[in-house]
Amino acid sequence: MGKPTLLEPGHLYNVPAEHKNDVPIHYIITWIKQRLPEFGGAIPTSLADRVLIIKSRTGSGKSTALPVHVFRILRNENTHSFQKYLGRSVICTQPRVLTAVTLAKDIGASTHYPDMILGQTVGYQTKPLTEKPNRGLIYATAGVLLAQLHTMTDDEIASRYAFMIIDEAHERALGIDLMLMYIKSMLERMLQRGSIGALRIPFVILTSATIDTHKYSTYFGIGKENIILVEGRQYGVETHWPLYNTNNYIKTACETALTIHKENIHDRPTEADILIFMPGMAEIRFLSMLLNNANMDLAKEKLPLMLILPIDSEAIAQENEAYLGLKAEIKNLWVKNPLTAKVEKPLRRVIVSTVVAETGLTIETLKYVIDPGWNRSIETYYPEWAGGLITRPAAQSRIEQRKGRVGRVFPGHFYPLYTKHVFEQIPAQQYPEIITEGPGAIFLSIVVETIKKNKEGVFKAEEIDMLDPPPTDALASAIERAIVAGLLTRGEKGLQLTQLGDIASRFSFLSIEEARMCFSGYFWQAAISDIATILAVVSVADKKLTNLLDSKQRNGAMLAEAVLAGIPPFLQNIDNAYTNIHLLLADDLLEGLFIFEGFQHAIVYFINNKVNNVAKHLREWCEKKMLKYSSMVQILARREDILNELAIVGLNPFHQWQNRLASANAETFLKRVCTLKQCMYEAYRLNCFCYDEHRLLYTGRNGIHFSYHDAVIKNPSCIVTPRIMLSPVSKQYMEWRLEPSFVSVLDGFVNVDINFLLPRQEIPNILGGAEDEEEEPPLPIQVFLHKYVKTHFHFSGKSFKELKMKPGQTIKFPETTLINMIPDIPKNVVQTYLEISVCHQYSFKRLIYCETFYTDMDDVQHENSVELIGLPMAAHHLTINDFNKLYHLLKPDGFLMVYDLHQSQEAFWLHSLQDALGHHTIRRDMDFHTIPEWETIFKECGFTPIFSKQPSEHELFIVFKK
């Protein structure tokens, strides 16, 4: 293998004329040393003294030679290996796990770098994989450095790293853009501290083959002298442009690979491999099938065979057979002859990969690249907040990266499946994810970093300092979501983080909705482990629960055995178990919770029985349940990450562990179901949808609508979903339809704010500072409290009339009241939380479980409604049979009365009951502690009791019919 061009003289550009023939790496190292005080350089005073951009063509050694030589600035290469390095490290970030791991291992095994020993002076750190020294050259995914910048102080980062090399800096993932924002802010803060902070400022190097040097240099405020251009490829790459485009790129890719194989049958195995890029795993599977069929034809013709290796992020994480085949030498690989079933040596490997092989990966035997020219990424559309995986033409910069996989060790060939004319029409650079996806999970981090620079401590959109700020509609949507979640509030001078928002901003990777759902879990006394599991299922299963199935033909019925493996014991022996569970829960997310519980039961069982090779037995268990083992492991890891995040910010991740849904009995099951649904509702309330009986569609507050059908649950009135997905209508046309990802039915479980679901009105000046707002007109009597009730408050027996409240009025209380109540909320506190609406008029088809409910029912028409009074603590004691009986008893003229006898509130409930019944002879000296006493009062008012239950001497549950 020849030397990288960084180590060969005469490849420098954009440097003084006298240095054009220098060895690039020597020039770069000298340039850096001239700016380091320990080598005689001046103390840095600006970003120009600490930021360098290197644009270096693929194959130049920017991912291998550059980090090693930078590390040698800190540690002489002739230092004996037994001498432990104790200085600061060099971190080199990579956009993907594969490249981070591969580069570290390759350098550790290379004879060119004898001083670089894996685990001693060089290593890697990714989320799933780590093998690194405490100090040295560390290859890491961008997410690792991002998390450190998020959680560590400037001094802690400076004490850990002397150099930060951001490789493939042209990639515009959300995390990379945020990481650059963090780095720039950190450098500016340390420079502002003068010489004390400047002496240890880390040196930042941005490298890429296709970086927009003007854009990045402008962002960091540096000049042309901070940009070094290096020519890359040592060998030529021939591009074979087709005459026509293809309308079936998978089939054409297979035909092209087969043609290459047959026409180059005399290739040496060490210079023969083919790499084919595909946009997703579905295409990889289909193409792999076609190539394996082609192997059958080759066997019939008695020609050498191909070894097909499908590679994606999952293959890398598991280090499966295909990944091991990629890393092995070709001479050690075998392929089975499909005719004789005998193994033989393959002529070449055909690697079918997603974009994980696009950057930073060197396959020394690679000679051919086939590129269909497509890229698949998430796109989100605002204000509807609907998104999905969209397949579009790849940008020219990405195509150059793909082309750059060959021509490193010997001449290569590039086969695009599109014409040169098409290539010239597509965008030069990829769109940043912050444009295509919006700020997403990094929004609160953007807010915090922007507030740090604001003298008044408020968030102003125009002050966001990123390579590209979020689009206005995406930013407005993110602000709205944060306000609704109680994480952001409008102060006198602008938008500010609430105390909940401050806690949420400390999470490394939880979105606004995920953070809110965790907080709601503490408010409502839910088992936080259940909350974490639900969020992990949403993250891994992505669109639908059936994505957890390891089967090509996926449907909900196939989930039955997996769901039943995790349900509570008291439900396991009922008839038509899965159908009844599906009907009872009416919730995809809770079914996902039970699927994971079953997997967890299996883990505990195998460990307790001390079986050998637990992983093998778990795989077999998943196969029996038709589940993807890899997906279940990912849920386990994601769940652990969420629980760790909670612990890091000081919250108890095992809060209410004893109240997990899987451990419920007949008396507590429905209460826990309601609690979890309440948490989902509070987290995703912007994604609540009501059924329109006229249009036969579900509609939401943003005006979007979609159809939803369930074989068992017929047209529920109100549902909530974590996200609205764009799903392709057909494979032939670029058309999509809207559909919910997971569905949680709220009917009969949660008190939904109907007014909140009305079509939203434009929010004036949502991106600017606070303005004087006109007083809102009173809302209809059915909404007694405004939909933005801010926090807990002690009721102390006063009625709302005594508090001089009006319909539609907003109540504001110090949010410290809320924070101080986490996680143990006193029972005598009226449980009205952030953003919880209070209303009382609902369709009779719904049995509402709510934690707080107040009404003032003077002059209210009771048409098709069930009226509620009081706190439904007793409702939590209803069994499943009670629930079913009650559900069928309710009629349009029914009257549901739920009562909790807290002494401090008794006077108020009597007052409210008196107003509601229009009956002014209720004796205040009565001791309303028994069902008969309450029945007497209601009979006097013309009501007949039809159902009653008294779980304890202090709790009553009665249904009356007019």
UniProtKB/Swiss-Prot annotation:
The chain crosses the membrane at residues 521-541. It is an enzyme of class 3 (hydrolase). Residues 43-229 form the Helicase ATP-binding domain. SMART domains: DEXDc, HELICc. InterPro entries: DEAD/DEAH_box_helicase_dom (IPR011545), DNA/RNA_helicase_DEAH_CS (IPR002464), Helicase_ATP-bd (IPR014001), Helicase_C-like (IPR001650), P-loop_NTPase (IPR027417), SAM-dependent_MTases_sf (IPR029063). It catalyses: ATP + H2O = ADP + phosphate + H(+). ATP binds at S56, R57, T58, G59, S60, G61, K62, S63. Its EC number is 3.6.4.13. It is a single-pass membrane protein. Belongs to the DEAD box helicase family. DEAH subfamily. This is Putative RNA Helicase B962L. It comes from African swine fever virus (isolate Tick/South Africa/Pretoriuskop Pr4/1996).
